[in-house]
Amino acid sequence: MEKILRVDKIQKYYGNKDNLTKAIDGISFDVEEGEFIGIMGASGSGKTTLLNCISTIDTVSSGHIYLEEQDITEIKEENIAKFRRDNLGFIFQDFNLLDTLTIEENIALILTINKIPEKDIDNKVKEFAKKLGIEDILNKYPYQVSGGQKQRCASARAIVNSPKIILADEPTGALDSKSAKQLLETLENMNSKLKATILMVTHDPLSASY
């Protein structure tokens, strides 16, 4: 399989030499196309920092991160937003949905920003909404649906643009046990049937076992 992500000896420090905090200390690993990898660790162990560095939200102190053959630690500031839109999908613990947009509009947002034709947007949104079991709530707003439905909306938004990799940061953290299990099954389905490559960080052993 093709190597999608390569993390090479990255370090991330905060503070100064008199009060230095090591958030990440020399981590290396690879993610191949089609894999669903879970990284488990306690709160404060650097999991979110790791995802932030991979997603270009934060910068590394040293080391390199490659998405396919591109060293993303070298991307210029003015090109970062486009890089994220073109290559990455995100699923956050707190959903990060816009309350003023419907579920359908939230899923479609990245396609709209990328100026995809309206007919294609409509077809793609409906396709993924059906596959993730939320086609009946597309006209509702986030505050009108459950936490589990919000997270499935976020999952649809993450995959609708066919990203090279989906980054999931504690995606079950705000869900009850039933909704968490349903979401994990959704992610597993996205990986096995929709061929999504997923890197998830979590403190939950059940989530990591998927």
Which ranges hold each PLM region?
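Exposed loop/turn and edge beta-strand positions of beta-sandwich/beta-sheet ligand-binding modules
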Residues: M1
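ABC family nucleotide-binding domain
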Residues: I4-L5, I10-Y210
